[in-house]
A protein has these predicted regions:
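Conserved, well-structured core segments that form the ligand-binding/active-site neighborhood
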Residues: 1-47
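Flexible, glycine/charged-enriched surface loops at secondary-structure junctions
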Residues: 2-10, 41-48, 79-84, 91-92, ...
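Generic structural hydrophobic/aromatic packing signal, biased to beta-strands
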Residues: 5-7, 32, 51-53, 119-122, ...
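Electropositive phosphate-/nucleotide-binding environments in soluble metabolic enzymes
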Residues: 22-26, 45, 63, 140-143, ...
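Glycine-rich, charged/polar anion/phosphate-binding loops
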Residues: 32-41, 63-69, 105-107
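Short, glycine-rich nucleotide/cofactor-binding loops
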Residues: 53-63
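C-terminal non-catalytic interaction/assembly regions of soluble proteins
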Residues: 66-178
Length: 178
């Protein structure tokens, strides 16, 4: 039994449906891909003192927002990942960790790049699973109070600070995809 129809929805930064593509699978896929490339394409910020990457659409897989954030920060800059997921991070059975010493066959452990001063992971619902997708580093701070996040950034950065904000970094992309 094959598919005779496929439906894809593109969402906006509030999680609302912004566009729907439907039709025969191959034709619909091509149309949805073309629409998604335009819809989610984002100019890449460069040399920002602070990069704020909100993972909203896939808050339970927040780490994906760092792929847009890390290339945007200048040496010595800070990255803030908003991983505000009340249910915590999803168990990823192929790439995720299971405790301290067991993981999926393709375990993903992202390294905080050398040029990043701090990676602040903000989640008002404290949990430790967010950090398990990252190599251990003293650069990583887990914070649950947004006012304290802002206070820490203000201490480190002066009044003339270049800030890049990705409102939905987990589904945005910065070119380079054919």
């Amino acid at each position: 039994v094959g598919l005779d129809m496929k439906i894809d929805a593109l969402v906006n930064m509030w999680g609302e449906t912004a566009e729907i593509c439907a039709g025969a699978p191959q034709a619909e896929y091509a149309a949805a891909l073309a629409a998604a490339r335009k819809h989610y394409l984002t100019p890449q910020a460069k040399e920002a003192d602070i990069v704020i990457a909100n993972s909203f659409a896939k808050a339970s897989e927040a780490i994906s927002g760092l792929m847009v954030a890390f290339p945007s920060v200048k040496p010595g800059g800070d990255v803030v990942l908003i991983a505000n997921a009340p249910d915590g991070q999803a168990t990823h059975y192929l790439m995720g960790p299971f405790g301290n010493s067991i993981a999926g066959k393709l375990q993903l452990q992202m390294k905080v790049p050398d040029n990043v001063n701090r990676l602040i992971i903000y989640n008002e619902y404290p949990e430790i699973a967010s950090g398990r997708f990252l190599e251990d580093s003293e650069k990583i701070l887990m914070m649950e109070d947004w006012e304290k996040v802002k206070g820490l950034l203000k201490q480190s950065h002066g009044p003339v600070t270049k800030v890049a904000v990705y409102p939905d970094a987990d589904i945005q992309y910065c070119g380079g995809i054919n």
